[in-house]
Every structure is written in C-alpha cells, then in structure tokens.
C-alpha cells in the first residue's frame, strides 16, 4: 500500500479538540501508549500518534476506493448522526446513524429481506400504489416505510456486506464492531482514552465526543475515499 500525504495538521487537530480524552479515572490502561499527558484530571491524546494512524487509515481507504470497494460508516449518537450522514453521502458510502439493529451484518439474509421490503414500499409510494389502498392498510404500510427509512435509509442501496467499516464510537457501536470481527470485515475505529485499541484493524486515537473532532477525522477519511473513487472512475 502506497503512503500518501493527507495534509494532517497537528494545530488543526488541537483547534478541533481531537486531543481531549476522558477523565483520568475513566480510562483503559491499553491506551497508555496513545496518551501524552494528564491535564486538570483529563487524559491528553498524543496527536502525533493520531496523525500517524489517521494517515494509515486514509491510505487504506484510498487504496480500497480506487479498487471499487464499498464502505459503511457507523455512528448512532444523536449529536453525530448528521455528520455521519453528510460524510457518507459526500463519499457515496453506506451509513447507519440512528440505531444499529443487532445482526445487521451477521444475519445479512434478514437484513436483505428488510431491504427488499423497503425498496418495494418506496416504489409503491412513488408510483401512487399506496394511495389506491384502503386508508387503514395504507396507513399501516406508511408506518412500516417510515420505520424502515429511519433505520435502513442509509443502507438502502447496499447489495452485500461492506468491504470496510468505519466506526465513530467504539463503546456506542460495540455490537457493530463485534459483528465485523466475527465476519472478518476490516474496521477503522475512532478510539477515545476509555477504549480498547486492539479491537479494530486501524484504531485512530481521538476525542469521540466533540463534534468538531469527529468531523475532522471523517473529513480526512471521506476526502481520501473521494480521491480513490475518482481514480477508479478514470481507470475502471
């Protein structure tokens, strides 16, 4: 895998608060190599390590995107949901930003059935099929459609398991991470000072609570994916 320059700036990361970890009492000792200091009861992440692993992750997604691989971005906390959707749409990735439904990947056949139902209902709605049904039946199907849109809207075009999964919060998305591990799907994960750095294929030490931090990391990854995709389009 070729190493590239991704304009990862330590000052920019500091301004975004990427270096702020959790309180010193709430930490995982495995994170010690990624922590540079303690300040006012808070662990401070070593941004040099962050830059290194973020650069590795950008290289990985660029390489994968240039070969037409598919990505899934997962981040379901309310405050990060919009950023996850925006990043995914910008890079033409699939995403889950409301709730991870258990078995979404490990029980793919069930997910696929739900997606077929979702697509059928969307088609019925667009062609006016629902309006021709009795009111009670139409109302029930519209509720189903709304539910499916909420939880599966970000993966409605997914036709198979993703090649790489990007996870915004290890603790919040632990079930998703475990499903990826079970299936052998490579993962890139933001890890705060209370996380386990050994679980993901590439762990990026960063503040996973501040929106500014999450956006910065996602922006870099999305830019790398877009760059890779443009190369794939030029040389299919």
Swiss-Prot record:
GO terms for biological process: translation. InterPro entries: Ribosomal_uS2 (IPR001865), Ribosomal_uS2_bac/mit/plastid (IPR005706), Ribosomal_uS2_CS (IPR018130), Ribosomal_uS2_flav_dom_sf (IPR023591). One of its GO terms (molecular function) is structural constituent of ribosome. Keywords: Chloroplast, Plastid, Ribonucleoprotein, Ribosomal protein. Its main location: plastid. SUPFAM superfamilies: Ribosomal protein S2. The keyword Plastid applies. It is found in: Plastid, Chloroplast. GO terms for cellular component: chloroplast; small ribosomal subunit. It holds the Pfam family Ribosomal_S2. The keyword Ribosomal protein applies. Belongs to the universal ribosomal protein uS2 family. NCBIfam families: rpsB_bact. This is Small ribosomal subunit protein uS2c. It comes from Helianthus annuus.
């Amino acid at each position: 895998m070729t190493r590239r320059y991704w304009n990862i700036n330590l000052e920019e990361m500091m301004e975004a608060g990427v270096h702020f970890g959790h309180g010193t009492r709430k930490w995982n000792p495995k994170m010690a190599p990624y922590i540079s200091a303690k300040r006012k009861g808070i662990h401070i992440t070593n941004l040099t390590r962050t830059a290194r692993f973020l650069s590795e992750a950008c290289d990985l997604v660029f390489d994968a995107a240039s070969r037409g691989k598919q990505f899934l971005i997962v981040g379901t906390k309310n405050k990060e949901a919009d950023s996850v959707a925006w990043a995914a749409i910008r890079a033409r990735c699939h995403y889950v930003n409301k709730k991870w439904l258990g078995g979404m990947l490990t029980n793919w056949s069930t997910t696929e059935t739900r997606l077929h139902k979702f697509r059928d209902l969307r088609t019925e709605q667009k062609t006016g099929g629902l309006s021709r049904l009795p009111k009670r039946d139409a109302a029930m199907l519209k509720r189903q459609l709304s539910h499916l849109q909420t939880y599966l809207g970000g993966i409605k075009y997914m036709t198979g398991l993703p090649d790489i999964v990007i996870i915004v919060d290890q603790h919040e998305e632990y079930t998703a991470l475990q499903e990826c591990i079970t299936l052998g799907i490579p993962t890139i994960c933001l890890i705060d000072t209370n996380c386990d750095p050994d679980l993901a294929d590439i762990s990026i030490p960063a503040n996973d609570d501040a929106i500014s931090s999450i956006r910065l990391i996602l922006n870099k990854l999305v830019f790398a994916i877009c760059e890779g995709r443009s190369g794939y389009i030029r040389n299919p």
